Amino acid sequence: MDIVSTRRLVRSEWFLAVSIATSLAFLLFGDALKADSADATVQAVVFIWLFLAILWSAMCVVRHAEHLAERLGEPLGTLILTLAVTAIEAASISAVMVHSRDQPTVMRDTIFAVIMIILNGMVGTSLLVGAWRHREQSYNLQGANIYLSVVVPLAVMSLIMPNYTHTTPGPTLSFYQQEFLGVMCIGLYAAFLAVQTGRHRGYFALEGEEDGHGHELSGGAAAPGASAWQHALLLLAYMIPVVYLAEQFGEPIDHMIRRLHAPAALGGVIIAALVATPEGIGAVRSALANKLQRSVNICLGSLLATIALTIPLMIVVAHLMGATIFLGLEGTSYVMLLLTLAVSVLTFGSGRTNVLQGAVHLILFIAYVLLIFQG
């Protein structure tokens, strides 16, 4: 790489310096910045600072993972992308679990929030803006059905079934039930990858569009002239501070919830928003560009990967920590999950979308947000 290309690369990756500087600041002064006795204004600034630093760094991680996916092909490309996003989410959930041992619902709340944000927020926005600009849009019905055929049983087995087991008290699973759930998640995701990248690759593309694995890049422009190994190094360079900062984010989330007397489920929403936003931006851009197939792949693909990979990983973390995790949803959350899954099956049952379908999903997302505070 020549000097000009190097300068362009440095300019395009300016946020890496911000991310590293933020990590050093919390490494050196983290205890003071996150102290429970700190002024409310200081705590608010720390919370916003960390949230924005993690969010933008995560967008950069996703961007470089997407470039690697394009260069390395499948299934390695898909695995890199999903593992990068899952690592960020797992670090965030683990941090909250460590600092809030009296909140055993954080994993459940985060998984549920991811489902609501993606299936209602991201899908609703993508369908609405896409149909508003292009009236009706098409996608491959078989691919959408395959996504949902895996998402629905994983969501039901992990978030509803624990309410009806009798081996342990409360909305929990026994050790062997948790192990089965983890193995089932990994097994179904492996089978899905085999279908997506091999035997039925065409189900995830629409005639006239490029291969359905593509993602709309987010987090800034691509590093100019960067090779695969440079994208790999930059991905690792961003991943180290973003995982560290995600671990530091546990205390500010806990402080914010206690200071505002907010519901504990809000912590899961914040973590889910960090994970879903980078790909959500790509999904909306794709819908606006009349590439709904790509948007569907981004939304449903990221949801499936999040559920299938985060649950087994967090089960292992909970065992290592000796922590109890509540999985079963209760009350209005239970109803919202069933309603969202049912509406999603109807939405992705025709191969074409319109404004009304997007509006319905967005209304469900607004209802979800309302019920967090008024449930």
What kind of region is each of these model predictions?
Residues 1-375:
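Hydrophobic alpha-helical segments, chiefly the membrane-spanning helices
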